[in-house]
Swiss-Prot record:
Record protein name field: Uridylate kinase
Protein residues bound to UMP: 55, 75, 136-143
Xref: Pfam families: AA_kinase
Quaternary structure, from the entry: Homohexamer.
């Protein structure tokens, strides 16, 4: 009997650090293969999946800005880093015979398709994995904001936030504070009021205004993406 997912269409947000694993920099081949296998498994269900990848494993725009670079230039470099990650993930997925398309907000026709909302939706309807790269194409906006915006544009049911080495949202950093409390459920307004570092405030406000749920969980545990898609209670669920 075919397994039925809880959601019809999801957006998976991966941080760049998640692709680096314990290496801290670059792309760990074992990690990206594991993530690709999990995404490919979800693609076989009755669920459409789009992926947004960060670029922090290669470059952070804010870091460059803090070191004296022009913020716009530093952010554009970060957008290019996300394209590198997207192409690496696409390659891993295609090795698993999973039909994949990379759509970039900055036009680079030789390596990817330009982002067009209707085209992205059509790819999803054809059960292709869609990877969004290059942020929203403008500096000063994070890939968290990209995830929120793209989720609204393609009418996704939820944003799945795969975190590196943390299994949900806590009241404080569990690595620093042993008394930190893990939340099973939060509202967007709670997240903003308590200053919980799930995503930046621009992305959080956008999700709240557009009623986009978030499910925050550990990406390092095998099978968690599928568990989240199937509706298992993992990590922290954030709703309006």
């Amino acid at each position: 009997m075919a397994q039925t997912s809880k959601y019809e269409r999801v957006v998976l947000k991966l941080s760049g650090e998640a692709l680096a694993g314990d290496d801290g920099f670059g792309i760990n081949p074992i990690i990206i293969k594991s993530i690709a296998e999990q995404v490919a498994e979800v693609a076989k269900l009755d669920c459409e999946i789009a992926v947004i990848v960060g670029g922090g494993n290669i470059w952070r725009g804010k870091t460059g800005s803090d070191l004296g670079m022009d913020r716009g230039t530093a952010d554009y470099m970060g957008m290019l880093a996300t394209v590198m990650n997207a192409l690496a993930l696409q390659d891993s997925l295609e090795q698993l015979e999973c039909d994949t398309r990379v759509l970039t907000s900055i036009e680079m026709k030789q390596v990817a398709e330009p982002y067009i909302r209707r085209r992205a939706i059509r790819h999803l309807e054809k059960n292709r994995v869609v990877i969004f790269a290059a942020g929203i194409g403008n500096p000063y906006f994070s890939t968290d904001t990209t995830a929120a915006l793209r989720a609204a544009e393609v009418e996704a049911d939820v944003i799945l936030m795969g975190k590196n080495n943390v299994d949900g949202v806590y009241s404080a950093d569990p690595k620093v504070d042993p008394n930190a409390i893990k939340y099973e459920h939060l509202t967007h307004i709670q997240m903003l009021q308590e200053g919980l570092q799930v995503m930046d405030s621009t992305a959080s406000s956008f999700c709240m205004d557009n009623n986009i749920p978030l499910n925050v969980f550990s990406i390092t545990e095998e099978g968690n993406i599928k568990r989240a898609v199937m509706g298992e209670k993992i990590g922290t669920l954030i709703t309006k």
